[in-house]
Amino acid sequence: MTGAPARAAASPGADEEAASQARLTAEFEALLAEGETVEPRDWMPDGYRRMLIRQIAQHAHSEIIGMQPEGAWLSRAPSLHRKSVLLAKVQDEAGHGLYLYSAAETLGVDRAELLAALHRGQQRYAATFNHPALTWADTGAVAWLTDGAAVINQAPLCHTSYGPYARAMRRVCQEEAFHVRQGYDLMKALCEGTPAQKAMAQDAVDRWWLPAVALMFGPPDTEAAGGDAKTAALGAAVSRRAIAWGIKRHTNDELRQRFVDHCVPQAERLGLTLPDPGIRWNEERGHYDFGPVDWELYRGALGDDTHTARQRLAHRVAAHEDGAWVREAAAAYAARQSGADTAGTSTEAVA
């Protein structure tokens, strides 16, 4: 009995399909090389689509979950003015999530699927928001530091290669920049207040600085930036592919450096001390040096299995379930309107 051939001959159809895929991929790469924008109806590699869905979904989830730390202080704001400013900010974050879910839907995925995956713990959000907001000063630190990191991280996305994402980010970044100014203004007011108020501001910075530096920019791209070999290899691989496709414009470590360079002078003007003894100006590099991040510590302290993380997700699921009647009513209204429009069109056609 003779053995079966090790590999069956490729069918002509398979060869044609492979050639077609190669041609489309080459055209796609050429489009990106020319700096053109990819639109929903354009052909794109499956890997590009998957990476975009993953990134946009995580971004949208982070906006929605990120409402919680500050939202908890709405009923305890010290004045009507501060309450109205914080309320507007929290509403903006909800709007950002909606813009981004809409951008994700242009890639052929439904936002209900994305939210269901989040609620099941199958998709992630920025672990920074697993950090508890313990005092009123935390609302200022979150806006100044976390939103400040978001602006630096997201501003290049206004020129990302996928059109709907880039257009959504232009609106998001304009509003996030305002949030940063609002947070800095609150920190300035506290620092110019009583000694107790300034101490509260310093305490908030002590707790929010490293989560912003560590978690808002993703894993390090090199071991020199503080990552172990496995973490650095993962960060570098993801960054290389995302940059090659024009989804990202800069590495995680480049963005992290920009954030530190931006915040150190601001902290000095406020009279606050950033909790990193390694921060010092490096004349040769033209940047501030800063200490390594203990990634294992932050994985444990702000991971998915902490009490605050479970609380954040449970609150999100409860809010989603409580709002089911609103979604059902909106869907029913849209269906009726669609039926009325169809009936009107049919009548006009008969006439």
Q: Model-derived features: where do they sit?
A:
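Extended, helix-rich structural scaffolds rather than catalytic motifs
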Residues: 199-351
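Conserved alpha-helical segments that form or flank metal/cofactor-binding pockets of metalloenzymes
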Residues: 13-25, 89-117, 183-187
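Helix-loop segments that flank and shape redox-cofactor active sites
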Residues: 42-48, 66-88, 149-165
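Extreme N-terminal leader/anchor segments
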Residues: 1-44, 48, 321-351
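Acidic/His metal-coordination segments adjacent to aromatic residues that form catalytic metal sites
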Residues: 37-57, 117-143, 160, 193-197, ...
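Internal, conserved structured core segments that host functional sites
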Residues: 129-182
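Alpha-helical scaffold segments that form or flank carboxylate-/histidine-based iron centers
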Residues: 48-59, 77-96, 139, 164-176
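Glycine- and acidic-residue-rich phosphate-binding/metal-coordinating active-site segment common to enzymes
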Residues: 160-211
